[in-house]
C-alpha cells in the first residue's frame, strides 16, 4: 500500500498492521501457553534433527517396527555408516532407542509420540496433492 503525504510517498508493507494495537488479555492468554525456553529449545532440536530427508526415511521405516541397522540401510538406500551416524543423531534427540542382540543392533521409535508426529506430518504434506 502506498500512502501519499504531501509530496512524499510512504510504502506500508501489507503483511504488517498499519497501526500498532495490542490486546493485553489475548497476549496474556497466549503467553501463558507458550513453552518455556528449555522446552522450546528441545522441540526445535527435535525438528532440526528431522530436517534431513535420510533421517526422515529412517523414522518412517521404523513406523513399521523394530529393524536392525543392516535392514534400515537396505530399505533407505543409505550406507551402513551413514545409517549408523543418522541413527546416533536420532537417538541423542530421543526419537529412537536401540538394543543390542548378539552382534546386531536393533532400532525402534522411542515412543508413540514420534509415530503421531510423523503421521500428522505425512497427512499435512498429502494435503498439497
Model-assigned labels for residue ranges:
Residues 1-49:
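N-terminal leader segment of winged-helix/HTH proteins
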Residues 87-88:
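Short, hydrophobic-biased segments on the C-terminal half of alpha helices
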Residues 33, 37-81, 105-112:
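N-terminal helix-turn-helix DNA-binding core of bacterial DNA-binding proteins
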Residues 28, 70, 116:
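Alpha-helical elements of the RecA-like P-loop NTPase motor core of helicases
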Residues 91-101, 108:
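Beta-hairpin "wing" of winged helix-turn-helix
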Residues 108-129:
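Conserved segment of winged-helix/HTH DNA-binding domains
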Amino acid at each position: 500500500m502506498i500512502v501519499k503525504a504531501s509530496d512524499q510517498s510512504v510504502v506500508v508493507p501489507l503483511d504488517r498492521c498499519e497501526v500498532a494495537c495490542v490486546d493485553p488479555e489475548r497476549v496474556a492468554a497466549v503467553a501463558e501457553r507458550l513453552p518455556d525456553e528449555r522446552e522450546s529449545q528441545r522441540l526445535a532440536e527435535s525438528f532440526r534433527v528431522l530436517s534431513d530427508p535420510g533421517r526422515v526415511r529412517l523414522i518412517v521405516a521404523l513406523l513399521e517396527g523394530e529393524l536392525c541397522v543392516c535392514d534400515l540401510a537396505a530399505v533407505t538406500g543409505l550406507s551402513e555408516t551413514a545409517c549408523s551416524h543418522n541413527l546416533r543423531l536420532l537417538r541423542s534427540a530421543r526419537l529412537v532407542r536401540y538394543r543390542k542382540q548378539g552382534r546386531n543392533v536393533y532400532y525402534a521409535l522411542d515412543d508413540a509420540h514420534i509415530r503421531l508426529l510423523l503421521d500428522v506430518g505425512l497427512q499435512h504434506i498429502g494435503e498439497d496433492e
